[in-house]
């Protein structure tokens, strides 16, 4: 009976994905605790190693130790590998190495990969190879651009800097080898555009990138049959709207605060960059601790939304947020069907979107209460850190390094939950919804 239970659990995609993340968190923790991983040769404490490993593999970027100073080159390499594996996705990375050595994937692994990448079983191998190839090409281009641009810097001969930051940006990780993130490059056009493009591409998701590649390839072959699917259209629409809206809000709220001493050009670049990075990546070109309260509030909303499904980003995802808005809009219009771009979104998708949102809100509320109990700091900073952790963003008001041991553990758990997703967590803890042959009579209830 016990074996049967274990066997059923391992067949669940959520369990497979979560187990993979936990294994790599453990490996990363052990490696970061080694004396060779730190600059002083003493190794990282267990709690700090767990936190850093979790933050890296879950591509978050929240830190409890100053990454560029505290860790050695070996420690930086460990963090970078964790970021790359976490950005690609544990199952995608495992599938790639299995394909490379000719090993067959287990059924549970195929189910997990199929769910994560929205692909058919027959196309798993092709999809994984395309993802790996496109990832390395994009990251390589980003690294080359940064290496050329940074050639005059004091670290100009060190190719590790551009490689580290290119991977961190594309994987939306937010880890940096600079003490003040990208504040010193707030007016640098090349750095702003390169990082922004890497972050946007990583935040769109492999499903969208694959669809865009397919459309582009068919366009070049003069075959117009391949079109953008509904998912891609929604993602591109929401991404564009959120970037523009975020840039405008940041400029309005900060033009007399953190942007006050900058030129108009630099104000525009900083506003654009912060809008891009706030939902997903966690890099910053301003002092986050000095932001106005309205900016904190809109940052919190953007971190909650996050990036797109199948991407390196966290949050409830742009498509989920779009579906929620569409449901509300259609209810006000007195319509039952959710119709978008001449397509109807099915009820199961709507139920998933609502479930993800509610579970996310409940999770965030719980962790806010726990941290308010364990940490003696204002609510404003607690809620900002909680949303940043859940959305795997990595922006911090400066609270994270000052957390108590219990606080660090709570944030680590929240980062993990935010990365694997509320829906996956619900699948692990509960039973899958099955179709019932017998249904009870329907009856109206009063809500609102």
Model-found features: residue ranges?
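Membrane-proximal intracellular helices of multi-pass ion channels
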Residues: 1-448
